[in-house]
C-alpha cells in the first residue's frame, strides 16, 4: 500500500476541518517568516542574496508571475489583500510595469518580508494597501532598492497602510536594505483618516556584511543625517512623541524598542532564528548572546548586521533555511519531544503549561508550515535578463528542493502554478503536494528517512548549480549576439 493511501476522501475532509480551525485559532501564527540577507562582499561569488520563508498554516505554495505590461493612462488596478483576497480598493495603474517572478523582477530587484505586528492601534483599517500588495506593486514599478523604498513608502502615504508592523528586505544587484514600517494611529475627521500613511526607517546593510530578521523589528538607533546609509520618514520620531511612546533625545530614539517592544516570545521565538544564522556564519563567539536568544535578557540585543567569518555560498545560505538549531542549546533532536527518531519539529502550541510550569517549544527557521520559500540571487556581473535568479521551493524547506528560475522568464511551470490545486484540493501534479507528501513521510523516522531525503536534495541542488553556470554561459553568448528570441528560449531553464 503506497503513500496515496493517506490522501483518501476522509483525510481530505479532515484537512478542510483542520484548516478552518487553524484560521480561527492560530491567527497569531499565520504569517511567521524568516529572511536572511547576504551582501556582495559577503558572498562567495559576489552576488547579493535574500532568503524568504513564507510560513503560514494556511498558505498554499505557488510561484506567482506578473508579466511586463503597458496600460493606458487612467487605468485603475483593483487591490486585494495578499493571502486573504479581501477587496481593499483601487489605485491608478502604472503606464508600464516590469516582469515579476515570485518576489524578484526582471531588473534583479528582490523584496521579502517578516511580520512583527507591534502596537495594535497603529493600523489603518481603511487603508487601501497591505504589505503584500505593496511588495508586488513595487516589484512591478521599481528597478533598484532605493527606488523601491521610495515607491513602497509613498504608496503607504498616498493610499493608506492597512497592515501592522513589518520588516522588509529590499535588495538589488549592488545593495541590500532592511526597511521597517508600521502604520500611524488613525485620526478620523468627518469619516476620513487625515493621518493615513506609515512611519518607517530603512538601513543599508554595509557591503561585506550579512543580516536577517524573523518577525521582530531589529533597527534600533539610526543615523539622522546619513542618506547614503539610512532613510526614514520625517515623522518617525515625532509621531512616537505624540503618542507618548518616546520622550528622549532624537539621536537616542530606537525604532524597534519604541514600535516593537521586546518580550519573551519575540526573543525566543523570533530573534533566536537570527541568532542561529549569526552563530553559524558570523565572526566571534555568539554564546555571549544566548541569554538574549533564550528570552532572558532583552538588554543584550544582537547587532543589526554582522561580518561573516567566511564568505557565504548560495548552497550555504539555502541550507541555513533548513536549520533546526542543530548543535546549539536549542537543538530539538535531544529532548523527549523528538521521540525515538530525533524529530526536530514541534507541531503546536509554541508554549503550554504542565503542573504550573510553562514549557516552550522552539521555533526554528525550518518549519512544517512553510507555504513557499526561496533564495533570491542578484548577480551584477551579468545583464539583467540573465543575472536574476529565484531559487524557489515549496512546503518545508528541510525536505524540499530549490528550483532555479530566471526572473526574465515569461511563463511559470504548471507544477508551481497557482491554478494547480489548493490547500484543500490535492493535485498529483502540484509540487507543493508532492513535497508535502515527502515531508509527512520523513517526519515518521526523521533521522533515517529525513537524512536520505536531504541527501537527494543536496545532490540535486549541487547539480542544478552547475547546470545554471552552463546555462548562464550559453545565455550570455546569445545575449551578446543580440539574438533576443533565442535568449528567451535559453532562460526557460
Identify the meaning behind each predicted range:
Residues 17-26:
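Sec-dependent N-terminal signal peptides
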Residues 340-469:
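Substrate-recognition/cap regions that form aromatic- and gly/pro-loop-enriched pockets
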Residues 241-389:
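Glycine-rich, aromatic-lined ligand/substrate-binding cores of catalytic
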Residues 33-131, 151-311:
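A contiguous strand-loop segment
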Residues 8-17:
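Positively charged n-region of N-terminal signal peptides that target proteins for export
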Residues 28-32:
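Sec/Tat signal peptide C-region and signal peptidase I cleavage site
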Residues 454-493:
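Histidine-centered catalytic/metal-binding microenvironments
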Amino acid at each position: 500500500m503506497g503513500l496515496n493511501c493517506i490522501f483518501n476522501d476522509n483525510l481530505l475532509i479532515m484537512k478542510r476541518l483542520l484548516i478552518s480551525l487553524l484560521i480561527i485559532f492560530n491567527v497569531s501564527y499565520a504569517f511567521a517568516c524568516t529572511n536572511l540577507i547576504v551582501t556582495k562582499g559577503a558572498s562567495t561569488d559576489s552576488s547579493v542574496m535574500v532568503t524568504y520563508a513564507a510560513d503560514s498554516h494556511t498558505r498554499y505554495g505557488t510561484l506567482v508571475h506578473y508579466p511586463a505590461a503597458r496600460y493606458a493612462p487612467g487605468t485603475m488596478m483593483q487591490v486585494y489583500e495578499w493571502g486573504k483576497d479581501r477587496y481593499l480598493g483601487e489605485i491608478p495603474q502604472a503606464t508600464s510595469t516590469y516582469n515579476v517572478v515570485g518576489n524578484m523582477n526582471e531588473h534583479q530587484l528582490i523584496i521579502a518580508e517578516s511580520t512583527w505586528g507591534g502596537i495594535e492601534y497603529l493600523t489603518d483599517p481603511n487603508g487601501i494597501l497591505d504589505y503584500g500588495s505593496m511588495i508586488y506593486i513595487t516589484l512591478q514599478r521599481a528597478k533598484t532598492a532605493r527606488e523601491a523604498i521610495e515607491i513602497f513608502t509613498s504608496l503607504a502615504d498616498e493610499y493608506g497602510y492597512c497592515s501592522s508592523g513589518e520588516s522588509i528586505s529590499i535588495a538589488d544587484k549592488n545593495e541590500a536594505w532592511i526597511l521597517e514600517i508600521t502604520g500611524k494611529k488613525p485620526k478620523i475627521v468627518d469619516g476620513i483618516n487625515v493621518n493615513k500613511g506609515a512611519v518607517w526607517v530603512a538601513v543599508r546593510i554595509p557591503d561585506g556584511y550579512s543580516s536577517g530578521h524573523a518577525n521582530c523589528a531589529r533597527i534600533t538607533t539610526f543615523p539622522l543625517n546619513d542618506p547614503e546609509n539610512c532613510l526614514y520618514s520625517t515623522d518617525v520620531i515625532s509621531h512616537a512623541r505624540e503618542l507618548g511612546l518616546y520622550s528622549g533625545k532624537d539621536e537616542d530614539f530606537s525604532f524597534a524598542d519604541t514600535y516593537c517592544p521586546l518580550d519573551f516570545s519575540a526573543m525566543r521565538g523570533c530573534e533566536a532564528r537570527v541568532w542561529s544564522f549569526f552563530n553559524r556564519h558570523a565572526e566571534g563567539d555568539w554564546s555571549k548572546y544566548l541569554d538574549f536568544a533564550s528570552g532572558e535578557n532583552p538588554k543584550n540585543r544582537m547587532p543589526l548586521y554582522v561580518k561573516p567569518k567566511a564568505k557565504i555560498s548560495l548552497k550555504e545560505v539555502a541550507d541555513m533555511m533548513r536549520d533546526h538549531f542543530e548543535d546549539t542549546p536549542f537543538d530539538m533532536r535531544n529532548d523527549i519531544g523528538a521521540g525515538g527518531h530525533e524529530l526536530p519539529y514541534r507541531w503546536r502550541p509554541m508554549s503550554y503549561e504542565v503542573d504550573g510550569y510553562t514549557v516552550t517549544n522552539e521555533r526554528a527557521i525550518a518549519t512544517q508550515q512553510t507555504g513557499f520559500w526561496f533564495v533570491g540571487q542578484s548577480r551584477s556581473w551579468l545583464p539583467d535578463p540573465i543575472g536574476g535568479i529565484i531559487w524557489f521551493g515549496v512546503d518545508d524547506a528541510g525536505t524540499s528542493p530549490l528550483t532555479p528560475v530566471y526572473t526574465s522568464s515569461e511563463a511559470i511551470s504548471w507544477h508551481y502554478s497557482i491554478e494547480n490545486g489548493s490547500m484543500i484540493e490535492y493535485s498529483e501534479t502540484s509540487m507543493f503536494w508532492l513535497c508535502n507528501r515527502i515531508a509527512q513521510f520523513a517526519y515518521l523516522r526523521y533521522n533515517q528517512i529525513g537524512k536520505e531525503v536531504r541527501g537527494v536534495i543536496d545532490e540535486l541542488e549541487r547539480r542544478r548549480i552547475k547546470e545554471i553556470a552552463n546555462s548562464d554561459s550559453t545565455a550570455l553568448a546569445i545575449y551578446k549576439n543580440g539574438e533576443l528570441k533565442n535568449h528567451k528560449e535559453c532562460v526557460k531553464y
